[in-house]
Amino acid sequence: MGRAFEYRRAAKEKRWDKMSKVFPKLAKAITLAAKDGGSEPDTNAKLRTAILNAKAQNMPKDNIDAAIKRASSKEGNLSEITYEGKANFGVLIIMECMTDNPTRTIANLKSYFNKTQGASIVPNGSLEFMFNRKSVFECLKNEVENLKLSLEDLEFALIDYGLEELEEVGDKIIIRGDYNSFKLLNEGFESLKLPILKAGLQRIATTPIELNDEQMELTEKLLDRIEDDDDVVALYTNIE
């Protein structure tokens, strides 16, 4: 994948290690999930997943409980909005936001793009077709081994639940399926009693591009600004 990819991955991991930034994003996901489907994780799969992802980032239980309670307060008045943009070198950007003030959010995003020559926000729907939406689950390889399952066994067991692709990455196993199969795949993990490390819906570029180190470094400046915004909970690009 090249040095540019490694640079991008290392930079992203470093940013997401800033707990002061990641916790507010995780809390918003929990609050919105509780608002949409109720505050009981046992009956709200979306909330279960949001809590799971928060625990994976070592978010304290008190923070999780506070985020759930916030769903019934004025602070819980959040909405999900997606924005799209283009940058230099053919880079396409999709930004998923959770906000209580869409006017503030779009104004901030426009300011980041305006500070980057050649970058701009584009009308929603302009880039949607350039990305596939997928359900993505992560689990630990040793958890699969603890269940006396091979990777082939796991793949066979989850096919009926919507699995499309299984990939081994280090000590983790990545499971991908159709966007609409998220709930079904979640049920598949539960039926196997296989702990989920992380889960979510992701956008995967249909035609990824590669940038050289210089191009990546310039692009990172814009991506940093976007990801540092508390209203942005997910950022997707077509960078390989």
UniProtKB/Swiss-Prot annotation:
One of its GO terms (biological process) is regulation of DNA-templated transcription. GO terms for molecular function: DNA binding. It is found in: Cytoplasm. Keywords: Cytoplasm, DNA-binding, Transcription, Transcription regulation. Coiled coil: none annotated. It holds the Pfam family Transcrip_reg. It comes from the Bacteria. InterPro entries: Integrase-like_N (IPR017856), TACO1_YebC-like_2nd/3rd_dom (IPR048300), TACO1_YebC_N (IPR049083), Transcrip_reg_TACO1-like (IPR002876), Transcrip_reg_TACO1-like_dom3 (IPR026564), YebC-like (IPR029072). One of its GO terms (cellular component) is cytosol. Belongs to the TACO1 family. PANTHER family: TRANSCRIPTIONAL REGULATORY PROTEIN YEBC-RELATED (PTHR12532:SF6), TRANSLATIONAL ACTIVATOR OF CYTOCHROME C OXIDASE 1 (PTHR12532). This is Probable transcriptional regulatory protein HPAG1_0159. It comes from Helicobacter pylori (strain HPAG1).
